[in-house]
């Protein structure tokens, strides 16, 4: 039967029954559309700064990330600084990956193209899965701020032993872009339709 014939038959049926189209009231809409708010789940997050020149006192990027995650309700598991040495970076990140009390690691520095920039090379072998969209999204957001210079950012992320590792550039502005534009929401279990928190709880994640 043609679609228009079906439509005509259905219209006639509605006229015969005299049934009015359902119009949700404010109360009905609230009952049907609103889900109970999820309680916030605080994470234990470690922050690593990679720099050959800064000290912790001079580390504005690491301080920004530490302050921001605490302000968001998370716990700063540890904050550290290491030189741009591939093996020192890998050792520090590996320690946190092996610690069941650390849910996520955020690093700053070492993602450029200078000879000593080795963050991606240090952490990529540790990944069980790479979060490819992180670098793509970071560069897309950065383009609005620094134009095509964003091509020189090698921001990377991955999952290892149910721990998320996010590697940001060394500038405080880049850390702000990464936190405000991506990580603040994706490390919040209330973010829909999905976020990273279920993958960090040492259980198989499920959708609700």
Identify the meaning behind each predicted range.
Residues 2-7, 12-208:
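Non-catalytic beta/alpha edge segments that cap or flank active sites
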